[in-house]
């Protein structure tokens, strides 16, 4: 299954739950900035390979995409790579401002864990999912890679 409009709408809906704000707008701007959605596509393909409906993977795919996007928002900041463009469009800190970009990245990361917990799996599996996401996005995973990049 390729990522479709239904999944894109799901991503936006999860960002804008409860209310709208400048930070949520920056989160949505970054999340919907034209990525290829490779990670969700891989997850959906695996689910379909096991004969499952890809939609059961929406919460996990959304969480993974939010974590990936948070890393890009923070990577573009002046203190990191100081990139003005991301995928041919102004980086979040250029489209909004640096403080909003930091909050948007933080918001995407924390929202990812909330969304992941909406997965249709057992409590034990949810704990394993959150543990894996936090490790791979954490100091020994993605943050370690960013540290090497500085």
Please give the residue ranges for each predicted region.
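N-terminal amphipathic/basic leader segments beginning at the initiator methionine
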Residues: 1-15
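Mg2+-dependent prenyl diphosphate-binding active-site environment of isoprenoid biosynthetic enzymes
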Residues: 12, 16-150
